[in-house]
């Protein structure tokens, strides 16, 4: 019977939906090593040194081969919103997996033209970008509130897993004969797209989308299966009516346009999501993940493939900690502390690299290089448990269902835009100012901590509907961690006012309870129709 599938459902959802993150990570983790392989450079490099018999890529070509996947991803995450609204997240995920697979095939079969690989990277990026919006969104809409943060963190866990495995594959293939060096490294990514596409076929559409398109009975069935309860049970019916009421209320103003996500009721969260996702890239994480091979070479490391693999292993291992950190300490504090920690690590990394790495005779200082690797590992230790997963959690859970697809698309587009800018311009900047580049990232990390302190509210343990009420209230972000919004009591107040003839849109008293006080202060906010 259907209700017996509940426990397995969450596990299956975690694995197959999060595989979309693996696809993203595999591309990120492979490109740096692939573009450094001998056969790849012999075919696609635009520079040759006859004295050393070494081929190399110019900064422009290196930046294009590395960064164009992000251009495709930017486009993919924008078009994912209207497609998901039309076909649902489940079918959209399947479709964009197919797009990703086509892009990988074109890369593997590339003729001796670097332009074909660049174009294929754009096509692959369309799939990756769309899935970076759809996968966390599907998880947020389907997972129970008590584990929603953990569920969404699994997406980032699989991103880091993909990066690490790609580094391991590069380590094993870079000595193979001729084109096998890079074709195997790229081609194995087909497997991740196929696994994701097949796995999602066995998962249901999210109940929120089903209610949105009028398939209420199917939504109740999905709710009952995930909760391991009968469809007519009180818990399932209460959850269904809560979702139904929330969705009807939010869609009363008509279809959501792109302009409406910048309306006064939602623009605070729209800009917050854009800032958080932009700052996630500006932490400097992809400085190591895209160019870890080159960075390690510059630091005088003899085995850059091994060093890059070590960095990726630290990233993957520490992401498991993020699953605990976000559920135990919430969203705000880890992001604030993580930003400060990462800023310190980058400052030391850059100071050592720019002042102590090279002796006067031009040889590298191995001790200074070791310190830089330690600082890079400590940076990743903090990033993997804070900014890496928390940014996706905030974007996945902060928006009302009417605005969710478009707001998440705009926020994630900001992430991909900065991803491209960093990946493309890093070779130029690194060649110009060297390791002083890290001072820029140190400043951005500190800025990120300040932005979170001033603008992000604590949402740990709240339902998506309660989160909406929290952001509609007047609670200051730095005070939001002390309060647990009592959604059911607030609804009782609304119903009482409605019963007495109160018009919709009137001032509603939001009843909130402080977790550390006996009093029950009230906050007044204007709940207006979303137009």
Swiss-Prot record:
The chain crosses the membrane at residues 14-34, 63-83, 92-112, 117-137, 149-169, 184-204, 271-289, 306-326, 333-353, 368-388, 409-429, 437-457. Residues 514-524 have a biased composition (Polar residues). InterPro entries: MFS_dom, MFS_sugar_transport-like, MFS_Sugar_Transporters, MFS_trans_sf, Sugar/inositol_transpt, Sugar_transporter_CS. One of its GO terms (biological process) is D-glucose import. GO terms for molecular function: carbohydrate:proton symporter activity; galactose transmembrane transporter activity. Glycans are attached at residue 361. The modification Phosphoserine is found at residues 507, 515, 519-520. Pfam families: Sugar_tr. Gene3D superfamilies: MFS general substrate transporter like domains (1.20.1250.20). PROSITE patterns: MFS, SUGAR_TRANSPORT_1. Belongs to the major facilitator superfamily. Sugar transporter (TC 2.A.1.1) family. PANTHER family: HIGH-AFFINITY GLUCOSE TRANSPORTER GHT2 (PTHR48022:SF89), PLASTIDIC GLUCOSE TRANSPORTER 4 (PTHR48022). This is High-affinity glucose transporter ght2. It comes from Schizosaccharomyces pombe (strain 972 / ATCC 24843). The lineage of its organism: Eukaryota, Fungi, Dikarya, Ascomycota, Taphrinomycotina.
């Amino acid at each position: 019977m259907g209700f017996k599938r509940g426990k397995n459902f969450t596990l299956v959802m975690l694995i197959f939906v999060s595989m979309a993150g693996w696809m993203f990570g595999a591309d990120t983790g492979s490109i740096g090593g692939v573009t450094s392989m001998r056969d790849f450079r012999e075919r696609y490099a635009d520079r040759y040194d006859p004295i050393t018999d070494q081929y190399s890529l110019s900064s422009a070509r290196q930046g294009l081969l590395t960064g164009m996947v992000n251009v495709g991803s930017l486009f993919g995450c924008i078009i994912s919103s209207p497609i998901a609204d039309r076909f649902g997240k489940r079918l959209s995920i399947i479709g964009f997996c197919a797009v990703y697979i086509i892009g990988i095939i074109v890369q593997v079969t590339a003729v001796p033209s670097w332009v074909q690989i660049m174009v294929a990277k754009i096509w692959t990026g369309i799939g990756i970008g769309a899935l970076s919006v759809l996968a966390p969104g599907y998880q947020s809409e389907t997972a129970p509130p008590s584990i929603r943060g953990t569920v969404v963190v699994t997406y980032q866990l699989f991103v880091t897993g993909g990066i690490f495995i790609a580094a391991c594959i590069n380590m094993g293939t870079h000595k193979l004969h001729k084109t096998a060096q890079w074709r195997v490294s790229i081609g194995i990514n087909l497997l991740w797209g196929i696994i994701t596409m097949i796995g999602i076929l066995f998962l249901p559409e999210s109940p929120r989308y089903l209610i949105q398109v009028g398939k209420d009975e199917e939504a109740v069935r999905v709710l009952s299966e995930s909760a391991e309860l009968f469809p007519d049970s009180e818990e399932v019916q209460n959850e269904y009516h809560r979702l139904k009421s929330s969705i009807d209320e939010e869609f009363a103003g008509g279809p959501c346009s792109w302009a409406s996500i910048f309306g006064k009721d939602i623009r605070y969260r729209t800009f917050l999501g854009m800032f958080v996702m932009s700052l996630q890239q500006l932490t400097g994480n992809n400085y190591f993940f895209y160019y870890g091979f080159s960075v390690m070479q510059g630091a005088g490391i003899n085995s850059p493939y091994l060093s890059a693999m070590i960095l990726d292993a630290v990233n993957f291992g520490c992401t498991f900690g993020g699953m605990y950190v976000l559920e135990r300490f919430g969203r705000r504090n880890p992001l604030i502390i993580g930003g400060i920690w990462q800023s310190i690590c980058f400052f030391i990394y850059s100071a050592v690299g720019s002042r102590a790495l090279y002796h006067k005779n031009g040889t590298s200082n191995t001790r200074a290089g070791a310190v830089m690797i330690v600082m890079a590992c400590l940076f990743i230790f903090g990033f993997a448990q804070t900014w890496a997963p928390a940014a996706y959690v905030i974007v996945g859970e902060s928006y009302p269902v009417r605005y969710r697809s478009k707001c998440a698309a705009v926020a994630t587009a900001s992430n991909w835009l900065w991803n491209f800018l960093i990946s493309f311009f890093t070779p130029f900047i690194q060649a110009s100012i060297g390791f002083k580049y890290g001072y820029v990232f140190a400043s951005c990390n500190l800025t990120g901590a300040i932005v979170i302190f001033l603008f992000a509210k604590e949402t740990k343990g709240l339902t998506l509907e309660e989160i909406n009420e929290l952001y509609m209230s007047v609670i200051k972000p730095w005070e939001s961690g002390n309060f647990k919004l009592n959604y059911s009591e607030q609804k009782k107040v609304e119903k009482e006012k409605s019963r007495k003839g109160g018009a919709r849109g009137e001032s509603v008293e939001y009843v909130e309870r402080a977790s550390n006080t006996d009093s029950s202060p009230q906050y007044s906010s204007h709940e207006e129709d979303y137009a």
